[in-house]
């Protein structure tokens, strides 16, 4: 029985009779009379009409890609993460009553000023153990009323930044952190309670705990552990810090936002304790028109720097040591929400956001109150401190792996001068820490993660002479490899030598 004939019979079973002439017109064939509803099914063998293969492309070049497990140094860092410290930080931040950006900056016990003073002291404690390699600074500015309806009088907005200088590649910087300001139902209520336990004391607690631990280690690249302010008023602190870095031509190689990483339960009580979401933007917000057109023509919309950073984080942080799986979400952020990674993306940097797997909106941006017997508000009692600690392990794996690998290769390209079955790649070494070699990774275009890897050595070009792994059928990436097997995120090769449609 022909495929068209069989398909039309299948349609006849599930569609209204009046639709059949339309299908028949498209198929250019005649449709046999409809069988009765009691007739035996005709599609018993349908699943076998298109047998899938265990692997496609049919031949693999290189080897199957395996996730990167932590070495002894990273295992030691993970083992030092203290659930008690994370809980104590969250409880302390919630105890300030409100940390609204417009709240008191002078009251020693209540308001954002008291929280900032306490956080600065705690970051400084970490720095004191670093033998001078970590410094604590304030990134401050005055925000005036104007086009922002959530700023109703001039206010000092201060982000606390603890920067750990890299031992071998100090000019390359990775930024991580959460926001320490909070809010309730009214975005300009700066006097009512807003404990902000999950949103976002949970993220700040991770940043502070990792600063404490990392200060006694020597990552090769620099890491900034931050606590942002002004997030609830429009990502203001992160925007100012990102622009400060940009104005100083800082090499920010990645920004990892930690915003709401403390609760695994949804509003209906569903628990998802071993997954964490990672939101990864698609086409870069600052990409020029030529690059954007080329990206679309080669099907690279899903291989932005942010998404390849996300794939890298999945590889290094989803394992038995973290007890978590990183779940990539191909979006900038959740619907109608924003986060402090966005200003970094808008400044031309690569940024992603960690978020817990479920959300309870009765606990977010809510007044602390009881309505119809139900407790509302972002309270400490909602926290799952074990989950928050596992999230910290994920972030520790991320930051250590990134900071100890070489930077991504530069100017990665794929030669399309001629039409053939082979692929030729070229790239340039990254600035800073020299790689020990490079790898070409690839996957089928519909796969979310890299599946195969080719080790090419310490070269800056490679000819792939296998006709079975064709550039039309897979997505390629090139990544740097350093000492200890630490790898950079992969970079999508853009075509060169083409005359049309690329």
Swiss-Prot record:
Glycosylation sites: 156, 247, 367, 415, 421, 463
Keyword Glycoprotein: yes
Cofactor note: Binds 2 Zn(2+) ions per subunit.
Main subcellular location: secreted
Enzyme Commission number(s) from the entry: 3.4.-.-
Alphabetical GO biological process terms: proteolysis
Cofactor or coenzyme needed: Zn(2+)
Cell compartment(s), UniProt: Secreted
Pfam families reported in the protein's UniProt record: Peptidase_M28
The Fibronectin type-III domain, residue ranges: 408-502
A molecular function (GO) term: metal ion binding
Superkingdom of the source species: Eukaryota
Binding site for Zn(2+) 1: 179, 199, 259
Signal sequence range: 1-17
UniProt: Zn(2+) 2 binding residues: 199, 232
Record keywords: Glycoprotein, Hydrolase, Metal-binding, Metalloprotease, Protease, Secreted, Signal, Zinc
Family annotation (Gene3D superfamilies): Zn peptidases
Any single GO CC term annotated in Swiss-Prot or TrEMBL for this entry: extracellular region
Family the UniProt entry places it in: Belongs to the peptidase M28 family. M28B subfamily.
The protein, known as: Probable zinc metalloprotease Lema_P049800
Native source species: Leptosphaeria maculans (strain JN3 / isolate v23.1.3 / race Av1-4-5-6-7-8) (Blackleg fungus)
């Amino acid at each position: 029985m022909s495929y068209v004939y069989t398909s039309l019979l299948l349609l006849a079973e599930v569609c209204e009779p009046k639709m059949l002439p339309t299908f028949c017109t498209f198929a250019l064939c005649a449709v046999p009379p409809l069988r009765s509803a009691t007739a035996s099914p005709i599609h018993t063998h349908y699943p076998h009409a298109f047998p899938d293969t265990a692997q496609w492309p049919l031949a693999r070049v290189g080897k199957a890609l395996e996730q990167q497990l932590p070495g002894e140094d990273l295992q030691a860092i993970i083992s030092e993460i203290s659930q008690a410290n994370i809980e104590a930080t969250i409880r302390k931040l919630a105890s300030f009553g409100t940390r609204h950006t417009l709240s008191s900056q002078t009251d020693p016990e209540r308001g954002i000023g008291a929280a900032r003073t306490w956080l600065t002291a705690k970051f400084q404690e970490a720095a004191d153990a670093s033998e001078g390699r970590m410094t604590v600074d304030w990134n401050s500015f005055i925000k005036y009323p104007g086009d922002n309806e959530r700023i109703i009088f001039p206010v000092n907005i201060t982000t606390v930044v603890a920067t750990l200088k890299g031992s071998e590649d100090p000019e390359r910087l990775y930024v991580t952190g959460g926001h320490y300001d909070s809010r309730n139902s009214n975005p300009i209520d700066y006097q009512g309670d807003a404990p902000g336990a999950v949103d976002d004391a949970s993220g700040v607690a991770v940043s502070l705990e990792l600063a404490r631990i990392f200060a006694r280690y020597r990552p090769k690249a620099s890491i900034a552990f931050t606590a942002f302010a002004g997030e609830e008023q429009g990502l203001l602190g992160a925007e100012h810090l990102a622009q400060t870095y940009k104005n100083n031509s800082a090499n920010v190689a990645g920004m990892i936002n930690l915003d709401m990483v403390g609760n695994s339960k949804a509003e209906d009580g569903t628990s998802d304790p071993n997954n964490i979401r990672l939101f990864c933007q698609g086409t870069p917000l600052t990409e020029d028109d030529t690059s954007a057109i080329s990206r679309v023509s080669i099907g690279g919309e899903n291989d932005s720097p942010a998404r390849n950073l996300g794939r890298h984080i999945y590889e290094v942080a989803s394992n038995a040591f973290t007890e978590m799986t990183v779940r990539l979400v191909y979006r900038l952020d959740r619907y109608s929400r924003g986060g402090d990674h966005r200003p970094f993306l808008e400044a031309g940097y690569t940024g992603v956001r960690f978020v817990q797997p479920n959300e309870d909106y009765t606990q977010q941006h809510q007044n602390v109150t009881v309505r119809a017997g139900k407790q509302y508000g972002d309270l400490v009692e909602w926290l799952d401190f074990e989950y928050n600690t596992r999230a910290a392990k994920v972030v520790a794996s991320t930051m250590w792996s990134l900071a100890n690998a070489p930077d991504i290769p530069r100017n990665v390209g794929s030669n399309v001068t001629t039409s053939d079955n082979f692929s030729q790649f070229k790239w340039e070494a990254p600035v800073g820490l020299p790689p020990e070699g490079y790898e070409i990774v690839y996957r089928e275009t519909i796969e979310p993660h890299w599946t195969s890897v080719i080790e090419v050595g310490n070269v800056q070009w490679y000819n792939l002479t296998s006709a079975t792994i064709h550039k039309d059928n897979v997505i390629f990436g090139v990544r740097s490899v350093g000492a200890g097997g630490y790898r950079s995120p992969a970079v999508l090769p853009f075509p060169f030598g083409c005359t049309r449609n690329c």
